[in-house]
Amino acid sequence: MGLAVADVGWFNTENLFREANGETSAVLLLSCMDLRIAWKKGLRPWSSVCALRERESRIWEKTYVLPTGWMKTYPRIGMRPIARGIRRWWRQVGPKDSSARFERGLVISYPYYLHLHNQLRPDFTVYYNLDDYALYWPTIADEVYALERETVRVADVTVCVSKLRTDQLKAAVPEAAHKVHHLPHGTPSPFLSDRPLPLPADSPEPLSHLPRPWLGFIGSLEDRLDWPLMNRLADAHPGASFIIIGRPPAPSDEPWYGECARFLDRPNVHALGWRPQAMLGRYYQTFDINLIPYLIGHPFNEACNPTKIMDAMGATRPIVATAIPECRLHPELLHVAEDAESFLAAVKRILDQGSNDGLAIQRFELASQNTCRIVAARIFEYLEASRNVR
């Protein structure tokens, strides 16, 4: 089997399908980007990273730098270079004996990749849904939803990382409801601790000068976070160190940015900036408490499944989260807060317990049973089940 994944622009998609090579003969991870975005990143169509390369055994990568408008404005033309590249790769990794069985699989992560499916006509297609994409492109929401409904009809299996999106797509395309599955993110192998950690592990970089406890957040610093809550939390624990990992936001006139800037300016807040994916698991393990302070009611937070749930679960350390839908699914392992007072109380309670909430073993068990490799295998189980009911 050769499985092409279009695309892995988000780390969660890459982490999942990078561990799927146990189920397939080869995996091709595709990064596809607009020329303007690529230019800002220093990438050109002739850059070395745009060449097809086998980065590790049976895991191939290729980056496409495409003209502006390739996805939404003229997708039939824009997808052609990607389709040609996938066909060449299938021929390259497929058996030399043309009579041998070889399945050509395609994973698509946006509805617009339906045009890629139509050009390739693979043996099977998986629609891997990460978000409510109409929120990305609200001015063409009707077009996005129409294309998504057709994608669900055509795909052999649709996998949604959030339950809300699962329910929405089942209702929108009832004739394909049996092919739509809720499958939350898995824990990437590098994020899984070797053992349960009732107490924080050593830091991956010299931070011993910062006083404990360490309250950590890893992720984008944006409007989706409850910044007033974070400011209240910093006020409540002036002796704690708030360790923030993520690129600082660009200045903005939006009210959230003022609250964010006020938080980052505090003496007990330490914004470390961006860190490589390979290091993040160790940061989760070194925090006294991992924070998921998403703003309740924010449309993106309602529709998404934050990867940091299972990333932090793999570290086994205590997690305090606001009550967004996907966090509500783990009330026995996350300290889920319905409001600011409950969030503050949960943090205080854990710190009063010496940063050990007694749940490290249970979190370790859940993460171990839901690694990215195991979650990827479930997709192929869904695919087999779908074939059996045809």
Predicted features along the sequence, with ranges:
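A charged, aromatic-enriched C-terminal amphipathic alpha-helix characteristic of glycosyltransferases
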Residues: 355-386
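Carbohydrate-associated surface elements
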Residues: 164, 183-186, 195, 287
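A short, active-site helix/loop in glycosyltransferases that binds the activated sugar's phosphate group
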Residues: 116, 155-180
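Acidic donor-binding loop of glycosyltransferase active sites
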Residues: 268, 284-302, 317
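Nucleotide-activated donor-binding/catalytic signature segment of Leloir-type glycosyltransferases, i.e.
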Residues: 246, 256-282
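Conserved donor-binding/catalytic core segment of Leloir-type glycosyltransferases
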Residues: 206-225, 230-234, 242-245
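Membrane-proximal helix-turn-helix segments that form the acceptor-binding/catalytic region
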Residues: 92-94, 101, 140-158
